[in-house]
C-alpha cells in the first residue's frame, strides 16, 4: 500500500516521511519524539503579551467564586432530589453542600444583640421571670408560687 493514496498532502522526502520511516525503527523512536518536542518548545515565547493564549489558560482565569459554586451545587442537588432518585451518595453530597453553605455564612442564626439605649449607670427595670416550659405555661404557674410551696408558715405575698 502506498501512503500517498491515504494522505493527499503526502510529499516524498518531507519530514513527515522521515518520521514515518524512523517510527518503524524502535531504536530511533525516542530520538524522533525528542526532536519533535524540541521543535514544539522552540515555538514558545516568554513575552506575556503574545496573542497566542491557549483556551485552557483562559478557562482557568475565569474561575467562579466559591460562593457561587456552592450555590450551584445546592441547586444541582435540589434538582437531583426532585427526580425521585435518592442514593447514599446523593444524600452525602446534599449534606456536604448544606454544610459548606452554612460555613460560608449563607445561613444567619437569629441572634439577640444587646442594645444600650439607656445612659450608663442607669439600670433597666427587670421583668419577673416567666418559665417557658410547657407544664408551667399550660397550668399557668408562676415562679413566685413555686418559691412559696416550701414556706407554708409565712404570709402569702399577695395583699
Curated annotation (Swiss-Prot):
Protein localization: Nucleus; Cytoplasm
Keywords: Chromatin regulator, Cytoplasm, Developmental protein, Nucleus
Record-level GO cellular component terms: cytoplasm; female pronucleus; nucleus
Tissue: Low expression in testis, ovary and thymus. Expressed in embryonic stem and carcinoma cells. Highly expressed in testicular germ cell tumors.
GO molecular function, one term: histone H3K9me2/3 reader activity
Polar residues composition-biased segments: 149-159
Start and end residues of each stretch annotated as Disordered: 1-31, 140-159
Coiled-coil regions listed: none
Superkingdom assignment: Eukaryota
Any one biological process term the GO annotation gives: epigenetic programing of female pronucleus
UniProt cross-references to InterPro entries, sorted A to Z: Dppa3 (IPR029096)
Domain remark from Swiss-Prot or TrEMBL: Mediates binding to H3K9me2 via N-terminal region, while ability to exclude TET3 from the maternal pronucleus requires the C-terminal part.
Biological role stated in the UniProt entry: Primordial germ cell (PGCs)-specific protein involved in epigenetic chromatin reprogramming in the zygote following fertilization. In zygotes, DNA demethylation occurs selectively in the paternal pronucleus before the first cell division, while the adjacent maternal pronucleus and certain paternally-imprinted loci are protected from this process.
Record's protein name: Developmental pluripotency-associated protein 3
Organism phylogeny: Eukaryota, Metazoa, Chordata, Craniata, Vertebrata
Amino acid at each position: 500500500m502506498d501512503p500517498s493514496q491515504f494522505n493527499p498532502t503526502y510529499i516524498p522526502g518531507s519530514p513527515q516521511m522521515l518520521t514515518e520511516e524512523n517510527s518503524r525503527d524502535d531504536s530511533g523512536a525516542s530520538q524522533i519524539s525528542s526532536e519533535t518536542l524540541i521543535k514544539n518548545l522552540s515555538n514558545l515565547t516568554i513575552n506575556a503579551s503574545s496573542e497566542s493564549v491557549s483556551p485552557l489558560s483562559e478557562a482557568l482565569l475565569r474561575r467562579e467564586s466559591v460562593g457561587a459554586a456552592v450555590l450551584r451545587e445546592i441547586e444541582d442537588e435540589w434538582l437531583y432530589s426532585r427526580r425521585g432518585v435518592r442514593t447514599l451518595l446523593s444524600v452525602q453530597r446534599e449534606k456536604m453542600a448544606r454544610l459548606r453553605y452554612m460555613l460560608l455564612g449563607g445561613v444567619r442564626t437569629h441572634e439577640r444583640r444587646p442594645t444600650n439605649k439607656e445612659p450608663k449607670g442607669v439600670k433597666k427595670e427587670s421583668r419577673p421571670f416567666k418559665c417557658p416550659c410547657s407544664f408551667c405555661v399550660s397550668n399557668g404557674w408562676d415562679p413566685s408560687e413555686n418559691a412559696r410551696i416550701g414556706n407554708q408558715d409565712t404570709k402569702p405575698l399577695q395583699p
